Structures are given as structure tokens and as C-alpha cells.
Amino acid sequence: MARDYYEILGVSRDTDKEELKQAYRRLARKYHPDVNKEPGAEDRFKEINRAYEVLSEPETRARYDRFGPEGVSGAGAGFQDVGDMGGFADIFESIFSGFAGGMGSPTQQRRRSGPARGDDLRLDLKLDFREAVFGGEKEIRISHLENCEVCSGSGAKPGTRPRTCSTCSGSGQVRRVTRTPFGSFTQVSTCPTCNGTGMVIEDKCDACDGKGANQVTKKLKITIPAGVDNGTRLRISSEGDAGQRGGPSGDLYVYLFVNEDEEFQRDGINILSEIKISYLQAILGCRLEVDTVDGPVELIIPAGTQPNTVMKLENRGVPRLGNPVSRGDHMLNVLIDIPNKVTPEERELLEKLAKIKGDRTGKGGLEGFLGNLFK
């Protein structure tokens, strides 16, 4: 049986992204095959990588939390090559950059001057109550970086090309060796000439001022799944900022917030509301229409219904997120309206009823809920 990924990384299930990254760094440093030559270290390292690969991505983490390893059996591309690891590359660099001689420096050089993924973006979106219940299409407006169409993202004027930085020879890093009585120490820092890109643009593109990207505002249509709630996060792939040097774009994360409704409240996948009936309807029973998110529905009030009775309309609640065929219920709290005053005709009838029931009436003292009507 596969070990729990949280257990592998030594973290709790509610750990945040930063704590997860710190745990991964600590274990990756300890079990990396180039550092740890003990039997089983390489397998342990692969196990750690797999756990972090799943838990560091919000969508795969959510599937893992719900379905376990079977829910993420196809997630991730594995760890074939450190140079192709995207976000993992930065972590590895921070783990191993302190080793003498700059461990893995050829890979670091290729990475700094190679493709870089664009930044992820966040957008907060408000929904009406019924939009959150039933979902649907929503148009949003976003502002993000897109590759310059004139220079195709290179930042160089058309007809020219960036040149290799002469300061760092294209590595994006400069090294300084300090000799001491205890040995030589190498300090690695970002190249100040090319800012770590390994390339220098001499003739900048006029359209983007050499940045390779422009800020663009555009409209998008996104699909809101049925059953979303406050805090639900949607990922819109490749709609973040453009990548650098041919790298992929980041993602857009849309955080959903649901406006309150005057009539309905939500409790998980159930909907709550109140209905007010007269005392006679409560005593005798009745049929009446009540509002639901699906529209008016007939409700039968049984005779003798007591105040604060909760009545259930099955399958009239919120669709279950990810399985909209399954819905919660609509729970109605019955409030009974007892009038402060009654007409003379009503009073006469109620007094007759009180005599039949044997209740005392008049100023001498009243019993039962009818008493308030005779004051």
C-alpha cells in the first residue's frame, strides 16, 4: 500500500504552501543521490519528489485529499531531468547552490538563460447566490502580460538578436572565489549586466521597449461549475503572465465569493429559509407555495404543526460540486404568526373554541397561545 504523501513529507494535511516547500527542501537535500550514497536513498528521493509534485499543485492536492493516490495516478510528468522541472528547479538551486564549486552549475547555466515560466495571476470574482448554485458562463476582464507580437517575445528589434552576455558568458551568474587558510570558497550571484538572463539586448524592440511583453487587457468567458461556494478557486490554464525566452505562460486563479441572498441561506449543500403561516393554518393544516432556487414549489403543512418545525424539500438544495446530479435539500423553518388583535367576529369564534377546549378566558387569566388574543 502506498504511503501517505503528507506522511512522506512529514507535514499535516492543513499545512500551507510555504511549510510544504520547506519540508521538501529539507528532505531533498538529505536524500539527493549526489549527496546520500546509502542504499535506498535514491528510492526515498523519488518518493519525496512524487509527494511534493502532487501536493504542491492545488488541483492535484485537492484530488489527492478526496480520492487518495488513485485520484492522482496520472498527475505530473515525473522527474526525468532537473532541467525540465519548472518550479522545482528554483528549489533545487536553493538547496544545492551552497555546495563548493557550485554543484550542478551546467544545469543552472542552461536554466537561467533558458525558458522561464510566467507568473500566476489572481482575480477575485463575486457571484450572485443562484449563480453559485447553478453555475454557468461568466465573462471576466483580465490584465496580463502577453508576448510582444513585433519581436515574438525576444525584446530585440526585428532583424536583430540578443547577444550572449560577455560578463557571465551566458550563464546568468558571476562567481567569485575567495581563498582562505581553510580552503577556497565560491560565491555565486546574479550577473548585474544581464540580470541573470545570460543575454544582452543592444537594439531594443520599440513596441515593448525591450521587455519582450506588453500589458494587455482582454475579456474571457469562463465556466462556473454548479455548487461553488465562498473561497472556491478555479484555475484558468495559461492565462497568467507570458513566460520569458519562450517559456510557458502562467495560470490565472479565479477566487469566487458569493453574495448573500435576502431569502436564502446556505449550509453546505443544503439551503435554508423561513416560511410564516397563520395560527389557523398551523392548527388546520394547509397547502401553499414556497420559493426555492428552482422556483415556486407546493408545500403541504400538516395539521397541528408547531412553531419552528423544520420541513424538508428533498433535492431542492445545492448541486454537489463535481457531481451536479446529486443535490442537497431545502430546509424550511416554519414560523407561526399570532396576531396581536382580532376582530369582534373572530373573538366570538375563538371564545367558543376556548370553551370547547376548556381554556379559561377573560381578564382573570388565560391559558394557551389563544390567551394573548383576548387581552
From Swiss-Prot:
Pfam families: DnaJ, DnaJ_C, DnaJ_CXXCXGXG. CDD domains: DnaJ, DnaJ_C, DnaJ_zf. Keywords: Chaperone, Cytoplasm, DNA replication, Metal-binding, Repeat, Stress response, Zinc, Zinc-finger. A zinc finger (CR-type) spans 135-217. Belongs to the DnaJ family. Homodimer. Zn(2+) 1 binds at C148, C151, C205, C208. HAMAP family: DnaJ (MF_01152). It is found in: Cytoplasm. The J domain is necessary and sufficient to stimulate DnaK ATPase activity. Zinc center 1 plays an important role in the autonomous, DnaK-independent chaperone activity of DnaJ. Zinc center 2 is essential for interaction with DnaK and for DnaJ activity. Its cofactor is Zn(2+). Binds 2 Zn(2+) ions per monomer. PROSITE patterns: DNAJ_2 (PS50076), ZF_CR (PS51188). GO terms for molecular function: ATP binding; heat shock protein binding; unfolded protein binding; zinc ion binding. Its main location: cytoplasm. InterPro entries: DnaJ, DnaJ_C, DnaJ_domain, HSP40/DnaJ_pept-bd, HSP_DnaJ_Cys-rich_dom, HSP_DnaJ_Cys-rich_dom_sf, J_dom_sf. It comes from Nostoc punctiforme (strain ATCC 29133 / PCC 73102). CXXCXGXG motif repeats lie at residues 148-155, 165-172, 191-198, 205-212. This is Chaperone protein DnaJ. Participates actively in the response to hyperosmotic and heat shock by preventing the aggregation of stress-denatured proteins and by disaggregating proteins, also in an autonomous, DnaK-independent fashion. Unfolded proteins bind initially to DnaJ; upon interaction with the DnaJ-bound protein, DnaK hydrolyzes its bound ATP, resulting in the formation of a stable complex. GrpE releases ADP from DnaK; ATP binding to DnaK triggers the release of the substrate protein, thus completing the reaction cycle. Zn(2+) 2 binds at C165, C168, C191, C194. GO terms for biological process: chaperone cofactor-dependent protein refolding; DNA replication; protein refolding; response to heat. One of its GO terms (cellular component) is cytoplasm. Residues 4-68 form the J domain.
